[in-house]
Amino acid sequence: MNKLRSSAITQGVQRSPNRSMLRAVGFNDEDFNKPIIGVANGYSTITPCNMGLNKLALKAEESIKRSGGMPQMFGTITVSDGISMGTEGMKYSLVSREVIADSIETACNAQSMDGVLAIGGCDKNMPGAMIAIARMNIPSIFIYGGTIKPGKLHGEDLTVVSAFEAVGQLTSGKINEERLIQVEKNCIPGAGSCGGMFTANTMSAVIEVLGLSLPHSSTMAAEDLEKELSADKSAEILVSAIEKDIRPLDLMTKKAFENAISVIMAIGGSTNAVLHILAIANTAGIDININDFERIRQKVPVICDLKPSGKYVTVDLHKAGGIPQVMKILLNAGLIHGDCKNIEGKTISEYLQNIPDKPPTNQNVIRDIDNPLYKKGHLAILKGNLASEGSVAKISGVKNPVLTGPAKIFESEEDCLKSILNNDIKAGDVVVIRNEGPVGGPGMREMLAPTSAIVGQGLGEKVALITDGRFSGGTYGLVVGHIAPEAAVGGNIALIKQGDLITVDAVKQLIEVDLSDEELEKRKKDWVKPIQKYKRGILSKYSRIVSTSSLGAVTDL
């Protein structure tokens, strides 16, 4: 008897009409007993992150057929954070994570697919696919489209963040417009996701650690042949996983998520990983909360010197041994669990067996555990009267992660950026951007344009920026995001006024305004809930159902 899930649409006399439809798309008699595997293809020419995905999808499709499966390709959406950054369009970025998850779940479950191979590139593709995979719990694998190679200008490595910072450098007189245009024309040389340890590369690493993509695959360059070979191998492994009935929730254990958190600390990953790991774990039914990040941060050092705060890009990490080399160092130090398994059915200890104990001596990207860049992880969870549920501070590259200063308050990213470019922000200020949370934005925009402008003006060490919105993986400096409760639901960030003294202290994990509980309560009585300006459409729907950022900003609690 056929035990495949797809037998619901392929077996028996009553399914003759169903089979007739499948015959039209290429099925023959013998194919109805093969596993039907969805190929969730995020190919798009919207963004360089995704423009190379179709060749990987076609390669995977061929491999599925050769390995005894029947592929069915369907499209998923993407948006480009880099293009929508600083505009109203950025409100759709985090929303797209949910759309991607919903679309993959919908297609696979509607068609009774036996497994899914998801292919993505831009930031929200990875967590979106993982949320869907956790919901469905059918054999699954993820293929990352790959990182972009660095742009070059006069021997200097460039990334997209170089262009954002150039805007601030221009307005402060540090560069001229000719230099700005040179950076613009040279920072993105081809296909692939943004090249530093930004959000896309961070999340691809998370998926590799969780065991749902192949070892070494998360750091490959998009345009290199090994990426196509990895796609071919991934499809073959997925067919085998269906035969062995290896399912995502077999791999997505609490230990596996702890491993993922350890690795993002070690590589200096994006703040967005906090939000996305919380969302994926929630969907998988795993008890991971925001406090776990701080617990693990205290033990795990940063051992990779990667942009945005460091020197190197992801292709350099790949040459130095990639995520497996980082994991081997952490495993030897007792900082990850070696008994977690991957999609091939191998434990971490098994598949890292042939990885060297020490990083190569001819590189400076990965350091050994006793010579870290920072002794503790770079993503600190801050709490206090401005964030009772927590907030996320990125403190890599910051010499003094403590600042007390007067609040400069802005009700939107646009107003803040205008003020920065007018040189209104001074050393010692605490810039506050509020009403940009999951509900208030809605959509929790990333504040890359303001933070890059601050860094470009030379204020990165002298100004703190706090928000209920998010930050790009390309952000660095003394920044605190994901403040919860957010302003739109009456969080205390909504109650502060211009000039109130705010302390950001990443050493004591503290974020607070110098106001008494009585004063905050008095202001709360006068607070008026903002009117949601989106009455129809997806942003309106999202703002009504999205959870707090401290739970991952999910929409299916």
From Swiss-Prot:
Pfam hit, one: ILVD_EDD_N
Active site: 472 (proton acceptor)
Recorded metabolic or biological pathway in which this protein acts: Amino-acid biosynthesis; L-isoleucine biosynthesis; L-isoleucine from 2-oxobutanoate: step 3/4; Amino-acid biosynthesis; L-valine biosynthesis; L-valine from pyruvate: step 3/4
Domain of life from the UniProt record: Bacteria
Annotated cofactor note: Binds 1 [2Fe-2S] cluster per subunit. This cluster acts as a Lewis acid cofactor.
Record bears the keyword Transport: no
Binding-site positions, Mg(2+): 81, 123-124, 446
Gene3D superfamilies the UniProt entry points to: IlvD/EDD C-terminal domain-like
Family per similarity comment: Belongs to the IlvD/Edd family.
MF terms (GO), sorted A to Z: 2 iron, 2 sulfur cluster binding; dihydroxy-acid dehydratase activity; magnesium ion binding
Cofactor: [2Fe-2S] cluster; Mg(2+)
Subunit-structure text: Homodimer.
Alphabetical UniProt keywords: 2Fe-2S, Amino-acid biosynthesis, Branched-chain amino acid biosynthesis, Iron, Iron-sulfur, Lyase, Magnesium, Metal-binding
EC number per UniProt: 4.2.1.9
Residues noted as binding [2Fe-2S] cluster in the record, renumbered to the chain: 49, 122, 194
Sequence positions bearing N6-carboxylysine: 124
Catalytic activity as recorded in UniProt: (2R)-2,3-dihydroxy-3-methylbutanoate = 3-methyl-2-oxobutanoate + H2O; (2R,3R)-2,3-dihydroxy-3-methylpentanoate = (S)-3-methyl-2-oxopentanoate + H2O
Keyword Lyase: yes
Function: Functions in the biosynthesis of branched-chain amino acids. Catalyzes the dehydration of (2R,3R)-2,3-dihydroxy-3-methylpentanoate (2,3-dihydroxy-3-methylvalerate) into 2-oxo-3-methylpentanoate (2-oxo-3-methylvalerate) and of (2R)-2,3-dihydroxy-3-methylbutanoate (2,3-dihydroxyisovalerate) into 2-oxo-3-methylbutanoate (2-oxoisovalerate), the penultimate precursor to L-isoleucine and L-valine, respectively.
GO biological process, one term: isoleucine biosynthetic process
Protein name, UniProt field: Dihydroxy-acid dehydratase
Broad class of enzyme this protein falls into: lyase
